[in-house]
A protein has these predicted regions:
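Metallocofactor- and cofactor-centric catalytic cores in central/energy metabolism, strongly enriched
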Residues: 1-140
Length: 140
């Protein structure tokens, strides 16, 4: 199943979009089918990977590009041992204040580690991935 069901139609609408930050007239992807599948096992039997769109990156590394019209399709791989104080946020489209005060507001690493310790989930992956909060071109 394709993530974007009609990519050519979407690309045409995206090309006509002005690119204003308020997303006025943004050409949202319109799908009939959802590209998700139900779980086939109980959570304690599963390993969990975390992907966040908070735009997080480790202090001292390259932030996401928020100036590109298409957005930034890159990602940062962040070990779960990295402390919240060592994270920065390249944010566009949301105010990062809440996540700066408590990363679990958008990146629930600490809660998921507690779930792992209490056997609610099987195992949390050793790294998690952060992608940009600014990726208006869904075809990237």
């Amino acid at each position: 199943m394709d993530i974007i069901e009609n990519p050519d139609k979407y690309s045409k609408r995206f090309s006509a979009w002005r690119g204003d930050e308020r997303l006025s007239g943004y050409p949202w992807v319109e799908n009939v089918h959802a590209p998700l599948a139900p779980l086939k096992r109980a959570l304690p039997m599963l390993n969990l990977g975390l992907i966040s769109i908070a735009g997080a990156y480790i202090d001292g590394t390259e932030p996401f590009d928020l100036e590109s019209r298409d957005g930034d399709s890159g990602f940062h791989e962040i070990p779960v041992e990295v402390e919240a104080a060592d994270l920065r946020y390249a944010a566009k489209g949301y105010d990062p204040k809440a996540v700066q005060q408590d990363r679990n507001a958008q990146i629930p690493v600490d809660r998921l580690l507690q779930y792992e310790a209490n056997a609610v989930i099987g195992k949390l992956n050793e790294v998690w991935w952060s992608v940009s909060s600014w990726t208006p071109n869904a075809r990237l």
